[in-house]
């Protein structure tokens, strides 16, 4: 499946719009445990543990987005965007939301 942030796909014609689809992932981070587990990352100014969690959540959200597009009969996604929000206050939860327009191309 072609997944793009652009509204069109070069070399393909959109023949049908299936609608807006979403892929959402809620994840958590145990800040105390992860901080001590990756102290060298934090000292260096970056946290590899958190970057890894965020990357995993992003990949899961895109996989959910693709699954939803297939469910509605699409073979491509256009106008894809990603949003990140913290939630849960001091519990360290965050949500990653992928959105896009499911389309049929030829």
From Swiss-Prot:
It comes from Actinobacillus pleuropneumoniae serotype 3 (strain JL03). This is UPF0145 protein APJL_0492. PANTHER family: UPF0145 PROTEIN YBJQ (PTHR34068:SF1). Belongs to the UPF0145 family. InterPro entries: UPF0145_dom_sf (IPR035439), UPF0145_YbjQ-like (IPR002765).
